[in-house]
Amino acid sequence: MHLSAVFNALLVSVLAAVLWKHVRLREHAATLEEELALGQQSLDPVLGLKIDYPKALQILMEGGTHMVCTGRTHTDRICRFKWLCYSNEAEEFIFFHGNSSVMLPNLGSRRFQPALLDLSTVEDHNAQYFNFVELPAAALRFMPKPVFVPDVALIANRFNPDNLMHVFHDDLLPLFYTLRQFPGLAQEARLFFMEGWGEGAHFDLYKLLSPKQPLLRAQLKTLGRLLCFSHAFVGLSKVTTWYQYGFVQPQGPKANILVSGNEIRQFTRFMTERLNVSHAGAPLGEEYILVFSRTQNRLILNEAELLLELAQEFQMKTVTVSLEDHTFADVVRLVSNASMLVSMHGAQLVTALFLPRGATVVELFPYAVNPDHYTPYKTLATLPGMDLQYVAWRNMIRENTVTHPERPWDQGGITHLDRAEQARILQSREVPRHLCCRNPEWLFRIYQDTRVDIPSLMQSIRRVVKGRPGPRRQRWAISLYPGKVREARCQASVQGATEARLSVSWQIPWNLKYLKVREVKYEVWLQEQGENTYVPYMLTLQNHTFTENIKPFTTYLVWVRCIFNRSLLGPFADVLVCST
């Protein structure tokens, strides 16, 4: 009787435990379903698309993540993912290994030396690296239910969304061409910015690039604890960038610039259309000079006098514009029809990319700031095909500057420095070359206000602008190169024991008959087989007989190429092997 009671008590306890666990599992399942429903409800209004959830979950749990990248190193790599996931709790991306997972390149531990790729276009910056954590797909059973992002995603970092130069150079231009690097991406993609900034002052410009609202990292938390992208591209093309900011060596143009004015102007045409200013015409009904007015720092102290003198010198209307008092669309409308743009050095000068061909950029530099050391806008203006004139003016008169040593350090203040360093900076006549970004002497000088010396400024402008400034009638701005010469032949003859002739002929490149070219020449290289040096010849005809230094019973290698207008060098035709 005693054993039976004990057995019954144990049985009741086990059944109660099983029932309790069953109830808890049902409650947990109901909670997960509720969370998923809520997550999907919050996701749908933002993303606007739906996905077959059971099918997507099955693909992810069985197949895992798939990655294929282009580019040889982390600085030029863009990766295409299927089923890449992101944990909002860990703030890390996840690669789930399943039966169909692919990881190309499969770098092993080299993926951390230093990263898989750069998320921004600022090359090899340690705050801009992208990587992921690896997990088996089976781990999904123990993780929060994934919320699937149905949109094609382009995932990247903005570098500094409050600075207009960085917005255009580092973000908008690269985004524009990355979206066009892969078919259909420009029409389908949603931009995901993962650097952690807020919207910033120019977020409306990012919205112009895609028909879908961009999302910030902070907004992802509202979508779910674990997000999985059905299709994502990660990284940005750096091919349109022209400037490096001085993190490793003092700032300056990139060593290998790959963008021309043609690509810049294709981008600005798109932007002006999206801003609804492309067909507005000249806003003032006449030619004018546009002066950027700054309202907080780096002021032009005699701005009214400058406007008057520019108007008198060039017999043109002068107007001012500022980022603070004008919408960006109005700024673009004014810049895109201006004959000349005058501004203190600063981010607003990146709007020069909207200037018409033939216009002039005049960049003003405060006292002790060498224009040759800070050239992002000069580099932009002088890109092949931009067809802009560029003038740099520097204040050389100490008395014409007003400094602000009492301001905070990030606005040029120096009172936090010791007295000796303050005295040195105050007496310095030129800021030495330096790295980015907190050099106190640079900040002190670049935030000065300036009284522009009008005569020296006019002299600087007149050295570049000989006549009346203004846009030129649009012309074909792309430099077209010759193709290979065709049907290259050689014929040799021996004149006795010591003399020989080598006759070489060819036909014009086939694309020449479709082009208008001012000057056509041909370059011929002759090299005796076995020698390390060659002899170049520049010719105007399509055949030539060489006699000087041509030896009997000798083999020569001959290369021929066409040159347009002295500087457009075509490819060499296949080498000719000629024996005398």
Swiss-Prot record:
Function: O-linked mannose beta-1,4-N-acetylglucosaminyltransferase that transfers UDP-N-acetyl-D-glucosamine to the 4-position of the mannose to generate N-acetyl-D-glucosamine-beta-1,4-O-D-mannosylprotein. Involved in the biosynthesis of the phosphorylated O-mannosyl trisaccharide (N-acetylgalactosamine-beta-3-N-acetylglucosamine-beta-4-(phosphate-6-)mannose), a carbohydrate structure present in alpha-dystroglycan (DAG1), which is required for binding laminin G-like domain-containing extracellular proteins with high affinity.
Cellular localization per UniProt: Endoplasmic reticulum membrane
Protein name listed in UniProt: Protein O-linked-mannose beta-1,4-N-acetylglucosaminyltransferase 2
Chief location bin: endoplasmic reticulum
Lumenal side: 26-580
The keyword Nucleotidyltransferase belongs to this UniProt entry's keyword annotation: no
Enzyme Commission number, as recorded: 2.4.1.312
Transmembrane segments: 5-25
GO cellular component, one term: endoplasmic reticulum
Keyword Glycoprotein part of the UniProt annotation: yes
Key words of the record: Endoplasmic reticulum, Glycoprotein, Glycosyltransferase, Membrane, Signal-anchor, Transferase, Transmembrane, Transmembrane helix
Tissue/organ expression: Mainly expressed in the central nervous system.
Gene: Pomgnt2
Organism: Mus musculus
Domain Fibronectin type-III: 488-580
Membrane topology: Single-pass type II membrane protein
Top-level division of the source organism's lineage: Eukaryota
Similarity-based family: Belongs to the glycosyltransferase 61 family.
